[in-house]
Structure formats: C-alpha cells, structure tokens
C-alpha cells in the first residue's frame, strides 16, 4: 500500500487520542500515513512535572512511530501567538492531510482548525476523539460563506428529504441534471454537502 497522507495531531499529557488501546493510530490506517507532525506547547512558567509529562508523551509517540516506520516531526509552539501559529500551521497542511485536534491546549487546536479552514482544499478531514474513542468529524465551513438561491434550494430540499441522488434533486427542483451536478459540486467545495457512491448512484447528503 502506498503511503500518501500526512497526519497532524496536537498533544499534551497523554496519547490516548492518537493511539488506541492496541497501539494503533486513531482515525486512519497507519499504512496510509506518509509522515506525521506532532504539535505541542509549554508555558514559559511550566513546572518540572509538566515538562517531564510532555517529555514522556513525546518519548512514547516517538517509540510508536519508529515501530511503524513513519517519519515524524515534533513542533513546539507558543500557545498564545495565535496568528503566527495559524500562519505556520498552514504551511504544514499539504494535499491529503488529516488533522486530529484532540490533545494539548485548546487555543493551539483553535489555531490549527482555523488554518485547516483556510487550507480546506488540502484537508481530507479534521476530527476530535471523545473519551469513549468516538471520532467526531468537523466540517470546514468558512465564516464568510455565501450561497446562491439554487444552492439554498438544494440545502433546504436535503433538510426535508435527507440523502438524495443528484438526479432526484434535479427532478424535484425541475432543473437539468448538469446544472444540479454543477451546484452540488460547488456546495461540496464549500464543505456543506458530501457525495457518496451507492452502487452506480451518487448520493448527496448535508454535512451539518
């Protein structure tokens, strides 16, 4: 299997959001990961226990990634330099990147999420891992998003009907299949819908 995805994760005092109880990487098959970037932060007044805890977490991550033969980079940031962090995080988001926002300081996760929104064309998914191990995926919707009248009609129809095929949407809205296909693709680029394959049919569903 070809390794082709970058995995970016924030972390703090533990790794149970990155590795499951069997030591497998959460959110993706480890054989698909080309490299990993692990982001953490330390306050300038961090005490010895905090520093040692972060060090132990780094050591464990390092040992697991060496075991899987996955190249990695640790990045320490100042958590409160938000704009600088966003700018730098954007550089790490290459095509086919997945992002795990669960660990570490919340403000660092916010900066990484904001960077992901700005680089959404390169992002496969952004997610959070709950205490029970459930993966919660975040939609990447820019705050200044604008919708056309037909896009709104498509979204309203999906609200009422749930999942629908592209041809069914076209029939309901009395528009050509090519027109609806074009507008559904625009909504997908904006992060508002997903297209799923069910046999030969393309099914459309809202992200949120």
Curated annotation (Swiss-Prot):
The keyword DNA-binding applies. InterPro entries: Csa3 (IPR010163), WH-like_DNA-bd_sf (IPR036388), WH_DNA-bd_sf (IPR036390). The keyword DNA-binding applies. Pfam families: HTH_24. GO terms for molecular function: DNA binding. It comes from the Archaea. Keywords: Antiviral defense, DNA-binding. Signal peptide: none annotated. GO terms for biological process: defense response to virus. CRISPR (clustered regularly interspaced short palindromic repeat) is an adaptive immune system that provides protection against mobile genetic elements (viruses, transposable elements and conjugative plasmids). CRISPR clusters contain spacers, sequences complementary to antecedent mobile elements, and target invading nucleic acids. CRISPR clusters are transcribed and processed into CRISPR RNA (crRNA). Belongs to the CRISPR-associated Csa3 family. This is CRISPR locus-related putative DNA-binding protein Csa3. The gene is csa3.
């Amino acid at each position: 299997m070809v390794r082709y995805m970058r995995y970016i994760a924030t972390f703090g005092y533990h790794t149970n959001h990155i590795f499951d109880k069997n030591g497998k990487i959460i959110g993706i098959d480890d054989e698909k990961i080309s490299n990993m970037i692990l982001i953490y932060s330390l306050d300038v007044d961090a005490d010895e226990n905090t520093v040692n805890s972060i060090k132990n977490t780094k050591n464990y991550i390092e040992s697991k990634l060496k075991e899987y033969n996955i190249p990695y980079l640790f990045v320490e940031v100042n958590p409160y330099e938000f704009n600088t962090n966003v700018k730098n995080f954007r550089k790490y988001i290459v095509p086919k990147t997945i992002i795990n926002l669960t660990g570490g300081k919340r403000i660092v996760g916010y900066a990484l999420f904001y960077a992901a929104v700005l680089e959404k064309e390169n992002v496969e998914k952004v997610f959070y891992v709950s205490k029970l191990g459930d993966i919660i995926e975040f939609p990447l919707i820019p705050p200044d998003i604008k919708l056309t009248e037909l896009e709104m009609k498509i979204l309203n129809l999906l609200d009422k009907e749930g999942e629908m095929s592209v041809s069914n949407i076209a029939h309901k809205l009395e528009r050509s299949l090519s027109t609806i296909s074009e507008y559904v693709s625009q909504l997908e680029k904006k992060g508002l819908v997903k297209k799923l394959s069910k046999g030969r049919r393309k099914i459309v569903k809202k992200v949120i």
